[in-house]
């Protein structure tokens, strides 16, 4: 559906204070001896051009989100960071489509890995299995798809940076106990998923990020095989 069906914006300017409060109350954080500091990793998704730009989440919503996570109530679609996400914005917001947040997980033996991604891309979205386009830039009447890559080729000499606000962000969750260098490699591997599903992707007008998060319940003897399994 076209982007204009979005009613509000909820996924920008999320203050980490509510999340920090939740962690501090439960003694979760980096141990500095005298206390545990709740470090919160934060990435912003730009969605001010969808719905009302004055509707913003606050610390109370961050705290409520943590409480909700205890009950495993996550949902794909127009929730959380996906509320104001959109795709196919090569010619502006009038011809883009509404997107959202999605997730997927697999288990191979005792290894578990999953990903959650808020898709807010400049390019179009494709089914990585068969190459079929599922969302993206539309014609002015919003009835048919337009190939964003064709628009890039036709407009590549334009110097002005008119493509802003494209921020696709995600997190990879695994129970493998990776080290920092291995996590860096894992984040790079995860970007292959973007390349399979978003066209164009990794342009100078887009921000694409993946944050790996290991839950570290597997023995380190499994790490080498885990890297191969995650590559699949």
Show where each model-derived region lies:
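A structural signal for small-residue-enriched, beta-sheet-centric alpha/beta enzyme cores
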Residues: 1-14, 18-232
